[in-house]
Amino acid sequence: MIGKSYIFHLFLFLLILPDSIYSQDNICLIPQVESMVRKKGTLSIERLESIHFPDEWKNTGNLLVSDLKELANLSVMVNASNPSIHVKKVKMQEPEMYMLEITKQGIIIEAGDQTGMIHAFSTLLQLILGSEGKELPRLIIHDKPRFSYRGVMIDCSRHFWTIEQLKKYTKQLAFFKLNTLHLHLTDN
């Protein structure tokens, strides 16, 4: 009797398992965000044609726009009158904190400082690359770093790196929201 009950429960578990796997959120962000609320619907990436930054963030914003072009092959016009991506400087509770909202009309990014804006763009880039350039899910993300020091060390004294390799690696660190690069240059 125990054998039949065991087989029945195993069969039931295997029957239900695929539904639970496919029903999970398939949005993968590194590092995991503090909170994400999914909404019904999507935003077509083709609608992302323009962006607006606060004036004091224009230089950093232009670098982020070039990253959109380079990594996601997405060209956007900067500081248009009716932007589809709107970056706002707002007062936040903590440094590097941001809010990213994807609506049917466009994207709203709120950050208290430029670092928060950079982290929001890293999240947006991960969403765009994960969507294979088609549709972004409607959602609201609130995020901030859990640790103030997030970094890696490269031992350049034993394993040599070219300047170009270090520049590429530094861009990857920013993409994953790391803020410290320790270069170990000599042993003495």
Locations of regions flagged by a protein language model:
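Catalytic alpha/beta active-site cores
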Residues: 150, 170, 182-184
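Short, acidic/polar
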Residues: 161-173
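Alpha-helical scaffold elements within enzyme catalytic domains, especially in hydrolases
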Residues: 67, 172-175
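Aromatic-lined carbohydrate-binding/catalytic grooves of carbohydrate-active enzymes
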Residues: 176-188
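Acidic, contiguous N-terminal accessory segments
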Residues: 12-13, 20-150
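Solvent-exposed loop/turn segments at secondary-structure junctions
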Residues: 114-116, 159, 187-188
